[in-house]
C-alpha cells in the first residue's frame, strides 16, 4: 500500500485536478489513515474502522477524476462502480455483493503481478537456460535423457554473452510453450461462484498442461518464457491468501452516482428494485459483513468506501438514515468558474490542449494556443454551461473538439503549417453557436 503523506498525495492530485482542495484533503487523509492503522498493535488495529467519505458536487467538477487518480496512487486493491448498475437481491441484475467479488479479482491480479515482478530475475535466468538448450542442445545419455554437465561449455557461455547483448534477438527458434487453457465462460447464479470456478478449472485442465511448439524470434520467445517461468514460481494458495488479506486491510471501493439510488419524493407504485432496495443491500457491506467469493471468504469491516453524487434532484438526506451514518465525512465540491476552466486548459499534466497539440503534431501540424485564446475558450464553455445544462469541465471537450474540427479534417494536407488559436480564431468559430441558445443546446 502507499506510504505517501497527505501533503504528497494532494501534491500528486494537483498535477491532474484543478481546485477542489477540500475533497483532495479528505481522500488524502483517508488514504494515510489506512497506513497509520497498520502501524498499530493487532488488538487496537481491529477496533479502528475506516471513516467513509461522501463527495457531493455537480457533474464535471472532478469527483470521478479524483477516484481515477487515487486508484493509481493507492497501490492497494481498488474498484470503481456505478450505483445504478445494481438491483435488489432476487431481481434480474447485479447484486451489490459482486462489488467485493470484483475487488477480490482485482487484488488477485495485483498480487500476481507483484509476485511475478519479485520473481522476474529468477524467471529470466530460467528462460535464458531454455533458450540456450534450444541453441545448443545438451548431450544425451544412453536412455535419451539430457545430461547436466558439471560446468557450462565455452560455446554455451559464448552464446549466453551474445544473448544478453541482444545479438541473437532476431534469430528464429522453435520452442515448446504451454498451450493457452481452454477458455470457458460460465454464467453463474448469485452464490454459486465457487461451483462455477470449479467447473471452469475442470474444463481448463482437460487433457492436462499441454505444450505446443512455436516458431518465434528469440526476443519474443524470451518475453513469453519469462512470463511462463515467473508464473510457475508463484504459489497459488499463498497468492489467494495474500490477495484476500490485501482486500480486507487495504481495499478501497468508490461508488459513483449514489444520488441516483435515492428515494425521490412523491408516491411510486411497485417495488423499488434499484433504489432504496440497493441502499439496504449496500448497508451490510459498508457496516461490515462476510462475502463469499470464489477465492474464499472476505470480511468487509475495514474496506474504505468513498461515495459520490451530484445530488441535483435528490439530497444526501434522501439516503436511508443507516447509510448516511456510515458515510460520516461529507465533502462538497464547488462548481467550476471561468478561471478554473483556464487553469484546466493549461496546468494539468497532459491537459486537453497538450493532447490536441500532440495529436496534430503526428501530421506535422503545429498548433499554438495563445493566452487570450485560452481565456476565450474558457468563457465560451462557461457561457454555454450557464445557458444550457451545466456539465462542468466536460464542456471543454465539446468546445475544443468543435474548435479544431476543421484542422483535424485537413491536417493531412497541412504538413509543416502552424495554426495560431487566439481570441479572434475562437470567436470566428464559436461565437455564433454560443450566442444562439438553441444551437448551443444541440451542438455544444
From Swiss-Prot:
Residues annotated to bind ATP: 18, 60-65, 256, 322, 394
Entry GO MF terms: ATP binding; ATP hydrolysis activity; peptidase activity; proteasome-activating activity
Keywords: ATP-binding, Chaperone, Cytoplasm, Nucleotide-binding, Stress response
Any one Pfam family match given in the protein's UniProt record, by short name: AAA
The keyword Transmembrane is assigned to this record: no
InterPro entries, per database record: AAA+_ATPase, ATP-dep_Clp_protease_ClpX, ATPase_AAA_core, Clp_ATPase_C, HslU, P-loop_NTPase
Cited CDD domains: RecA-like_HslU
Cellular compartments annotated: Cytoplasm
Superkingdom of origin: Bacteria
GO CC field: HslUV protease complex
GO biological process per UniProt: protein unfolding; proteolysis involved in protein catabolic process
Cytoplasm in keyword set: yes
UniProt-listed SMART domains: AAA, ClpB_D2-small
Quaternary structure and interacting proteins, as annotated: A double ring-shaped homohexamer of HslV is capped on each side by a ring-shaped HslU homohexamer. The assembly of the HslU/HslV complex is dependent on binding of ATP.
Function: ATPase subunit of a proteasome-like degradation complex; this subunit has chaperone activity. The binding of ATP and its subsequent hydrolysis by HslU are essential for unfolding of protein substrates subsequently hydrolyzed by HslV. HslU recognizes the N-terminal part of its protein substrates and unfolds these before they are guided to HslV for hydrolysis.
Family: Belongs to the ClpX chaperone family. HslU subfamily.
Protein name, UniProt field: ATP-dependent protease ATPase subunit HslU
Encoding gene per record: hslU
Amino acid at each position: 500500500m502507499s506510504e505517501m503523506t497527505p501533503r504528497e498525495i494532494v501534491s500528486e492530485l494537483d498535477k491532474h485536478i484543478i481546485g477542489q482542495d477540500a475533497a483532495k484533503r479528505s481522500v488524502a487523509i483517508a488514504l494515510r489513515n489506512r497506513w497509520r492503522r497498520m502501524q498499530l498493535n493487532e488488538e487496537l488495529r481491529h477496533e479502528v474502522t475506516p471513516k467513509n467519505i461522501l463527495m457531493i458536487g455537480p457533474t464535471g467538477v472532478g469527483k470521478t477524476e479524483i477516484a481515477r487518480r487515487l486508484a493509481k496512487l493507492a497501490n492497494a486493491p481498488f474498484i470503481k462502480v456505478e450505483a445504478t448498475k445494481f438491483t435488489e437481491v432476487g431481481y434480474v441484475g447485479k447484486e451489490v455483493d459482486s462489488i467485493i467479488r470484483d475487488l477480490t479479482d482485482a487484488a488477485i491480479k495485483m498480487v500476481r503481478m507483484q509476485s511475478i515482478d519479485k520473481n522476474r530475475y529468477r524467471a529470466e535466468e530460467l528462460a535464458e537456460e531454455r533458450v540456450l538448450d534450444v541453441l545448443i542442445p545438451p548431450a544425451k545419455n544412453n536412455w535419451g535423457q539430457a545430461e547436466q554437465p558439471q560446468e557450462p561449455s565455452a560455446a554455451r557461455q559464448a552464446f549466453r554473452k551474445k544473448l544478453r547483448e541482444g545479438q541473437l534477438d532476431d534469430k528464429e527458434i522453435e520452442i515448446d510453450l504451454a498451450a493457452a487453457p481452454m477458455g470457458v465462460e460460465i454464467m453463474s447464479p448469485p452464490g454459486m461462484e465457487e461451483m462455477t470456478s470449479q467447473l471452469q478449472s475442470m474444463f481448463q485442465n482437460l487433457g492436462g498442461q499441454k505444450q505446443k511448439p512455436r516458431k518465434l524470434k528469440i526476443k519474443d520467445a524470451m518475453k513469453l518464457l519469462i512470463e511462463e517461468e515467473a508464473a510457475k514460481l508463484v504459489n497459488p494458495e499463498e497468492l489467494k491468501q495474500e490477495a484476500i488479506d490485501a482486500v480486507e486491510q487495504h481495499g478501497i471501493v468508490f461508488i459513483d452516482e449514489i444520488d441516483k439510488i435515492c428515494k425521490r419524493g412523491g408516491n411510486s407504485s411497485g417495488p423499488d428494485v434499484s433504489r432504496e432496495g440497493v441502499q439496504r443491500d449496500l448497508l451490510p457491506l459498508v457496516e461490515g459483513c462476510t462475502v463469499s467469493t470464489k477465492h474464499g471468504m472476505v470480511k468487509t469491516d475495514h474496506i474504505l468506501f468513498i461515495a459520490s453524487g451530484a445530488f441535483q434532484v435528490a439530497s444526501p438526506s434522501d439516503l436511508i438514515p443507516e447509510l448516511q451514518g456510515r458515510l460520516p465525512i461529507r465533502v462538497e465540491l464547488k462548481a467550476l468558474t471561468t478561471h478554473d476552466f483556464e487553469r484546466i486548459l493549461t496546468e494539468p499534466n497532459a491537459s486537453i490542449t497538450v493532447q490536441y497539440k500532440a495529436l496534430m503534431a503526428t501530421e506535422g501540424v503545429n498548433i499554438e494556443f495563445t493566452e487570450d485564446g485560452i481565456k476565450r475558450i474558457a468563457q465560451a464553455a462557461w457561457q454555454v454551461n450557464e445557458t444550457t445544462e451545466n456539465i462542468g469541465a466536460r464542456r471543454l471537450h465539446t468546445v475544443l473538439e468543435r474548435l479544431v474540427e476543421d484542422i483535424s479534417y485537413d491536417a493531412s494536407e497541412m504538413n509543416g503549417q502552424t495554426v495560431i488559436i487566439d481570441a479572434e480564431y475562437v470567436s470566428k468559430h464559436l461565437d455564433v453557436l454560443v450566442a444562439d441558445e438553441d444551437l448551443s443546446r444541440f451542438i455544444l
